[in-house]
């Protein structure tokens, strides 16, 4: 084998090892990002909502900092209710469509309907709520009490 081939093979192996250490996104999160993009007609990337205020992103505590952050708290609460119903909202896949009037759900099971409704409500709330750049990546230990 040629030295150049060995280098390429080594590089591929190393990159695969690095990729295996990246945890996968919850299945539903991918669908939720598409609902957000459909609802806001692509005006803001979904990742802007991942670390916003006290509730947008992982966890949440305290008083929401604004209307958009309240959307995230309502979404968190909705997922909590889904869990009480025996659903797994972060893993529940559902059918949805992005029409000219925005996104809508088209699902079969109770859990799919409930989780899709949670995500749809949040996506529409995000689309109508102002985004304040000052509330992105805030110090939650100080502002979320």
From Swiss-Prot:
Offer a single GO CC term for the protein: extracellular region
Binding residues annotated for Ca(2+), in chain numbering: 55, 57, 59, 76
Asked if the record carries the keyword Disulfide bond, the reply is yes
Xref: SMART domains: PA2c (SM00085)
Catalytic activity annotation: a 1,2-diacyl-sn-glycero-3-phosphocholine + H2O = a 1-acyl-sn-glycero-3-phosphocholine + a fatty acid + H(+)
Localization of this protein: Secreted
Signal peptide start-end:
1-21
EC number(s) per entry = 3.1.1.4
Similarity comment text for this entry: Belongs to the phospholipase A2 family. Group I subfamily. D49 sub-subfamily.
Q: What is this protein called?
A: Basic phospholipase A2 cPm05
Annotated organism of origin: Laticauda semifasciata (Black-banded sea krait)
């Amino acid at each position: 084998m040629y030295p150049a081939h060995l280098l390429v093979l080594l590089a591929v192996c190393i990159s695969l090892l690095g990729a295996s250490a990246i945890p996968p996104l919850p299945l539903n999160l991918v669908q939720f990002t598409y609902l957000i993009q459909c609802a806001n007609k692509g005006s803001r990337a979904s990742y802007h909502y991942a670390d916003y205020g006290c509730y947008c992103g992982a966890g949440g505590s305290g008083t929401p900092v604004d209307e958009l952050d309240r959307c995230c708290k309502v979404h968190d609460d909705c997922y909590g209710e889904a869990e009480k119903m025996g659903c797994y909202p972060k893993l529940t896949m559902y059918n949805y469509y992005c029409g000219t009037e925005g996104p809508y759900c088209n699902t079969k099971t109770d859990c799919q309907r409930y989780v899709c409704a949670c995500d749809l409500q949040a996506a529409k709330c995000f689309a109508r709520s102002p985004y304040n750049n000052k509330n992105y990546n805030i110090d939650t230990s100080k502002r979320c009490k």
